[in-house]
Amino acid sequence: MRIRPTRRLLLGAVAPLALVPLVACGQASGSESGQQPGLGGCGTSAHGSADAHEKEFRALEKKFDAHPGVYAIDTRDGQEITHRADERFAYGSTFKALQAGAILAQVLRDGREVRRGAEADGMDKVVHYGQDAILPNSPVTEKHVADGMSLRELCDAVVAYSDNTAANLLFDQLGGRRGSTRVLKQLGDHTTSMDRYEQELGSAVPGDPRDTSTPRAFAEDLRAFAVEDGEKAALAPNDREQLNDWMSGSRTGDALIRAGVPKDWKVEDKSGQVKYGTRNDIAVVRPPGRAPIVVSVMSHGDTQDAEPHDELVAEAGLVVADGLK
């Protein structure tokens, strides 16, 4: 279902105000900022006062009784929309898009120098595993226990189908926690904490920094992998295109950011959902005929059994789309 109501219908009594770009709050790790999910860290206008976007996001908090964090950047002109963009949230399966990007960045492709000990056969390298490795929600890997899967196939499975076993196999290929963290630090991300395997990473206990990031950090990582070219690019052009193709094929986010933006805007995304009502989506959004917008929406509730809200993410996407048209 596509969400395209008017703002007044969408957010209730929020009055339409002039749209003013939000200023980033300043990136800091959880240990440096001391922020916990759902506390502070809100975007402000250039004049330091709450603006239309902020009021809309706070209306969403009230409407869904949840805590959303949003970071969006228009790569055309650098305009940002933020709300709790530097607070920590459990990232859930959204990390799988970055995981696929990290794999692409580390294997030999078209004669490029290998960043660290990758096999010469690159993305065609076959990873073998046993039945004991299969986790719930592993619709692709469960069919290939006998023959194994290539890195390319595992990346497709982890992004398009959110395959949990594929995520763990790729985590090992990257060198576990240390290797995954090293790749992100090469992108300039000193915020994200990648710690555990599926399905332990889904605990999402408030205040636990493990397996968390911020909307800003994840959006910046996704931008490096999926959008940037030239010196800022984390991937070669063909690898970047491959990652975007995998995200385009993901259908787990149809009710999220994709549902909130205009129908003719192409969305390449990766969603996530874990405990405490955590519902996330990170996306490259491509309006026709112009540079893309990179969006990260993360959200959580207050109790372990809180309901996740697809509509919250979709409506946050609508606010972003209306603000960055």
Swiss-Prot record:
Catalytic site positions: 93
Signal peptide per UniProt: 1-26
Residues that coordinate or bind substrate: 270-272
Disordered: annotated segments: 30-50
UniProt keyword annotations, A-Z: Antibiotic resistance, Hydrolase, Signal
Catalyzed chemical reaction(s): a beta-lactam + H2O = a substituted beta-amino acid
EC number: 3.5.2.6
Protein family per UniProt: Belongs to the class-A beta-lactamase family.
Protein name: Beta-lactamase 1
Species of provenance: Streptomyces cacaoi
Recorded name of the encoding gene: blaL
